[in-house]
Structures are given as C-alpha cells and as structure tokens.
C-alpha cells in the first residue's frame, strides 16, 4: 500500500501526540496511593452535656481504616471503615463501663453496626488553600445515610492530618440520653485523622 506524503505526515503527528500524552497518563496512574491502614489513625471524639455532665465522661473512639486511597494528581480521596470494628478507648473508665459504652455505641440505638456495617467517605471537590493545605468536600455514608461534609486537611512530613465536625442527627442518630436527660451526649462530634500513604 502506497502512503502519500500527506498521510505519512498525519500518521507522524498522531504518533507524536500519543507519545506526548503517555507520560501524563503514566504520572496520573502513579499518583494514586493506598492508605497504609496499619499506620493511619482515625479518632472520633464524643462530648457530654447536661446538668450532671461533670459526673460523666467524654468518649474517645478508635475507628480502624479498612481500606482507602489518596490521589493528589486527581485531587481525590476515599476510605472505608468497618463500623463493627470501632472501639471505645476511654482510659478513665473501668473495663466493665467501657464494654457497656461500646455495646450501646454499636447497638441498634446508635450506630446499629450489624445493619449498617460500612462507613464510607468519598471526596467530591478538593480546594487547595496553600502549599500542603486543602479543604476537602465529600460525601460521608454513616448509619445508612449519606450527607455532605467538609474536611480541613494538612500534609506534613508525609502525613495527611485533618478534622471535621459532624452532627449525629444529620445521619439519623439520636444522641444518647441517660438519667432523665441530666446527662447526655452532644449532637456534635469531632472526627480527627492522620493518614499515611504507602
């Protein structure tokens, strides 16, 4: 088959264009990194309120990351937590009280973790504030409800640190109340994390 000079030039142009794009695709594919679940930490802080709150405790809850990915090239992030794996870490309570708090947290009155075992976050928009700082908007699925959340993130020494404020009622969870409402859990909880990418 005889190739004209014009056709040959077009083929050469196409080859050059594809060659120019290949490094971009390669960089894009390589920018996605898995979250190191062994070295990453996600903590939920739950606070008390009410008339006799001085006699109650704030709660610290560990939420092990099951899996997740970070992609600075595409400005995306997502992770999954198994709700059944959440653990109450409160150091100032007895083992018996800690077990009771955990049973309440995982049970049908709060997280209902057997019915809703997955907690998932997926970013929808990432805005760069300055070098190593971002505001991340995304969808959080918790207790079978998906709601938009905003997360402030900072990268330092290879670690991504951040926090967000959530309202339990936004996810269909009624804050725990005891002693006729004289001691109760605040609707607002704070989520803190430190992620390390592999």
Predicted segments with their positions:
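N-terminal secretory signal peptides that target proteins for export/translocation
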Residues: 1-6
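Bacterial N-terminal signal peptides
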Residues: 9-23
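Low-complexity, acidic/polar, glycine-enriched regions of mature
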Residues: 24-198
């Amino acid at each position: 088959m005889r190739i004209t000079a014009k056709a040959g030039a077009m083929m050469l142009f196409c080859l050059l264009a594809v060659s120019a794009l290949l490094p971009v695709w390669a960089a894009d594919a390589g920018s996605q990194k898995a979250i190191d679940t062994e070295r990453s930490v996600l903590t939920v802080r739950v606070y008390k309120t009410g008339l006799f709150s001085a006699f109650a405790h704030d709660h610290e809850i560990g939420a092990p990351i099951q899996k997740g990915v970070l992609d600075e090239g595409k400005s995306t992030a997502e992770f999954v937590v198994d709700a059944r794996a959440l653990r109450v870490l409160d150091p100032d309570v007895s083992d018996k009280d800690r077990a009771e708090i955990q049973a309440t947290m995982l049970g049908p009155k709060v997280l209902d973790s057997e019915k809703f075992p997955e907690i998932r976050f997926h970013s929808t928009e990432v805005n760069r504030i300055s070098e190593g700082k971002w505001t991340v908007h995304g969808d959080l699925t918790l207790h079978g409800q998906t709601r938009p959340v905003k997360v402030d993130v900072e990268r330092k020494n290879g670690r991504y640190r951040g926090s967000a404020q959530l309202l339990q009622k936004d996810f269909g969870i009624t804050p725990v109340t005891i002693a006729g409402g004289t001691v109760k859990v605040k609707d607002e909880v704070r989520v803190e994390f430190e992620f390390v990418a592999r």
